[in-house]
Amino acid sequence: MLIEFSVTNFKSIRERQTLSMVASNYYKELVDENTFEVESEESFPRLLKSAVIYGPNASGKSTLVEAMEFVDNFVCTSSNESQAGDRVGVVPFRLSAETRNGDSQFDVAFFEEGVRYEFGFCANSERVTAEWLYAYPKGRAQRMYTRYYNDDADSYHYVWGKNFLGGRRRTDWKNSTRPNALFLSTAVQLNCEQLQSPFNWFKSRIATLDPSILSASYTMKHFEERKSAILEFLSAADLFIADIKIDKIKFDPALVPSDMPPGLKEEVIKNMSGKEFAEAKFYLKSVDDGELIEFADDEISAGTKALFNFSGPWIDVVSRSRVLFVDELDSSLHPLVVHQLIRILHNAGKPVQMVFTTHDTSILGHKGILRRDQVWMIEKSDQQASILTPLSDYSVRDDEALEKGYLGGRYGGIPFVKDLTIGN
């Protein structure tokens, strides 16, 4: 599970910004509901099940989610889905000459299979310039490896920890690691069993979602195996969907627009011929006799479709103890539905975490949804760099109206809206 995530010099983030999922011992509310104890042989504080990030438009809320998505993809694919010479997908803070030409840095602390790990790397568009991994079995620090690029020598220097096994194979892993790839990714691809556990945390635990662009493909692909859970999920959101069926539809050349250029039309038909597409059909009960009435996709509201699209990934996250990063959780969803989603996660009965951004301040106004150490604010500095601040940095009273305080500007993270007069 996620302990801490830090980002330096990435997009709107200039100085190091850290999101911590460690629960504060100071707050006594919702301990059983919103925090959990890590199964580990070391004594470690409880972790939070969720964290919310508030901030105005263009403040950098999405940047943190994008940073984790980049790290996750880079760990999982840098060794096998890129070629020598491909650019690394980092984007530095561009409003300063110093950072514009500097490296981006990412640090992740997490638990996997009862062991704490600290993994991180620095990179620019051309190469990884540093990489490190430490393990803490029973709380004792063990270096697995460190990797640094020596610019003067144009070569990499590796230091192996005494507990990092592999013998001569470590040299093979090192020599096979391209400048634009991670050693962690490469070594696992070459069957390094000792690094499989931390690699699997990124591969199997981390998930990032943007509900505004989430399609129904994942939910439909896994629909039959999770049908009852999906219907229960939609019912919990107070949607009166009695049944859903997924039909397979073969591609029909007649659907290709007639005004499409002949050459392009021929290519489309050639590429799509014989392919099948999934289509969801929704059924509601008749108010007269309970008969199931079919509704086509275009007859279903955008909110219902958004929840259906979201249900598959959401159930996957909750059932598999994953760590979910969601950008704009409230997109197309009613505030009360958002509240219910958070409660479902908190009551999952197993370790599961979510970090999400939102503009929905009603979450702050409802007691029993979030603890004060689960709330974060992000805003731009005078240098237009994103600054992430926990609500716990402010002197917040037990009985303080958080929504009112936030909207009143007490904690930052709100837009400064100027008066605007439109001329005739």
PLM regions: where:
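Electropositive, glycine-dotted interaction segments
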Residues: 118-256
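Short proline/glycine-enriched turn/loop segments at secondary-structure junctions
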Residues: 172, 270, 365-367
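An exposure/low-complexity boundary signal
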Residues: 60-102, 175-234, 343-348, 352-353, ...
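Short polybasic amphipathic segments
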Residues: 5, 106-108, 128-135, 278-286, ...
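Extended helical coiled-coil dimerization/tether regions that scaffold
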Residues: 8, 212-299, 420-424
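Conserved P-loop NTP-binding catalytic core
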Residues: 35-52, 56, 65-119, 124-128
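Short acidic/polar mixed-charge low-complexity motifs
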Residues: 13-15, 113-117, 127, 139-141, ...
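Switch/communication elements of ASCE P-loop NTPase nucleotide-binding domains
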Residues: 1-42, 46-75, 287-417
